[in-house]
Amino acid sequence: MFWESELNAPLLWCLVETESCSTPRTRLPTTALGSCGERTAVQEPDWASVTLGVFVCQACSLLHRGIPHISRVKSVQQETWDASEVELMAAMGNEPAKAKYEQKVPAFYYRPKHTDCKLLREQWIRARYERNEFEFIEKQEPYSAGYREGFLWKRGRDNGQFLSRKFILSEREGALKYFNKQDARDPKAVMKIETLNATFQPAKIGNPYGLQITYLRDNSTRNIFVYHSDSKEMVDWFNAIRAARFHYLQVAFPGASDEELVPKLTRSFMKEGFMEKTGPKHTEGFKKRWFTMDDRRLMYFKDPLDAYARGEVFIGSKENSYTVLPGLPTSTQGYHWNHGITIVTPDRKFLFACETEAEQRDWIAAFQRVINRPMRPQEYAVEAHFKHKP
């Protein structure tokens, strides 16, 4: 992933002559944006691909080293350069490289940020420079065809074992389905594209290619955890889901622009982690639970990899009497962690406790972001039909 100057002015080159080499240097704006989304306050990036002619950030330089037949990385300041390498950097540069290697990126294709998992960042690099997927549209067929079929390792709902399962994604049927047996005629589950979401969770699943798929079943969230041994296959599945969502939303919202639809294709969870909770009477003992904040849905699980939440709480806006407060009511007892949070809703209060003050701050900030955001019309319908499991 390369540095992209946001200025229209050409890059300023100077050659620093030493006894054995010429070293290229470039002056960028004080905050430069890389294609991985990273901003930095340094003016002189330290790494470059001398075969592609682009500057790369340090994290992405490590990924470029994984494709040495395509990209050879050098330090700008600490390694020797020959004249041909300097000439290539001067002739190419980041903007021309972007115009060449990203000329036909589909609107739905996920462009990773520097905070995304290694899998997404690596496959983004390989898709551009190794497979040239965005120069030749026919190479995008695995995730652009509207239909995808294959096998993924799926975690069992009850036994926790990963078993090979057949998956079919069909835009025509508006669903992602999976089958317990290879020759089964009826699917075990049908996940409507309308409520489908996918997010990579390598640490949580315990696999570098682990993907968490969620969908609504009877207005409750169902989790499915899958992976594939091939990294490209897994990212192709992810982008195929995004393509299906994109085309569904284009029909559902015909007047919306691509820029409006793309943020709605898939989403990462706002916050996850363990907290303690008590029951609706506030006299029950506090129990440790895994919490997931998925937009306005706060879900809690006994185990992070549970298929279903033990309960779900809708978090509305401050205009609708939702509030987050630090601490717990003075009469509260039975908690083990000392950093409390109180969520006030129109119906009741929810009491949580965090292990550390830092976790408390992070959770409060996540709740506050949602509460400060006005509710959209469709969210009122979600609130009205929301099911809370006590």
Residue ranges: model-predicted function:
Residues 1-78:
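Cys/His-rich Zn2+-binding "zinc-finger" mini-domains, especially FYVE domains
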Residues 1-18, 122, 126, 145, ...:
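Cys/His-rich zinc-coordinating "finger" modules and their low-complexity flanking regions
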Residues 2, 127-145, 227-264, 268, ...:
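Pleckstrin homology
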Residues 2-3, 7-8, 58-142:
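Cys/His-rich, Zn2+-coordinating zinc-finger modules
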Residues 5-9, 26-32, 41-45, 85, ...:
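Eukaryotic intrinsically disordered and solvent-exposed regulatory patches
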Residues 26-29, 42-45, 54-55, 61-62, ...:
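Conserved beta-strand elements of beta-rich interaction domains across eukaryotes
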Residues 145-147, 246-308, 314-315, 319-338, ...:
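Disordered regulatory linkers adjacent to lipid/PI-binding modules
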Residues 147-191, 237, 267-316, 350, ...:
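Polybasic phosphoinositide-binding surfaces of eukaryotic membrane-targeting domains
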